[in-house]
């Protein structure tokens, strides 16, 4: 059932490995373009898309965030047995480009499928250090850093 819904989305599914991010714009790029991403300037993003700057290398927070994603997905499965937690590159190709807006892409950290309501939601996992957690609201709130 859930895979039928995924195939009906107006997107092209692509594997993460080998995907050329320079030919489209993703969520992180949008935050840079809007001027709310404190980690990159719009001029650097433009140069990166043009091939004038190398792709950004992963740093420790990015690496550890990625390492925690499987554990967080498992915890969600344990906490909410009526919800299927789908994993990129296992349950679906990890990158999607819009069929209507081909220059737009996303790479969700997963999908949540509620077996009771048959609703599909995007799962985006973020981890925060003790230094950055003050940018986030209390658990369950809708307060999150502007760049997201």
What are these language model-derived features?
Residues 1-71:
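Charged, glycine-rich intrinsically disordered N-terminal tails and low-complexity linkers that flank
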Residues 55, 62, 72-73, 79-148:
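Mg2+/Mn2+-dependent nuclease catalytic core
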């Amino acid at each position: 059932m859930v895979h039928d819904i995924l195939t009906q989305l107006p997107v092209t599914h692509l594997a993460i490995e080998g995907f050329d991010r320079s030919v489209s714009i993703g969520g992180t790029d949008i935050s840079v373009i809007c001027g709310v991403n404190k980690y990159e300037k719009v001029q650097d993003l433009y140069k990166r898309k043009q091939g004038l700057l190398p792709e950004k290398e992963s740093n420790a927070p990015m690496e550890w965030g990625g390492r925690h994603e499987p554990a967080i997905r498992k915890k969600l499965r344990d906490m909410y047995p009526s919800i299927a937690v789908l994993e990129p590159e296992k349950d679906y190709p990890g990158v999607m480009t819009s069929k209507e807006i081909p220059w737009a892409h996303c790479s969700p950290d997963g999908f949540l499928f509620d077996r009771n309501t048959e609703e599909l939601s995007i799962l985006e996992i973020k981890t925060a250090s003790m230094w950055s957690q003050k940018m986030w609201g209390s658990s369950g709130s809708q307060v999150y850093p502007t760049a997201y």
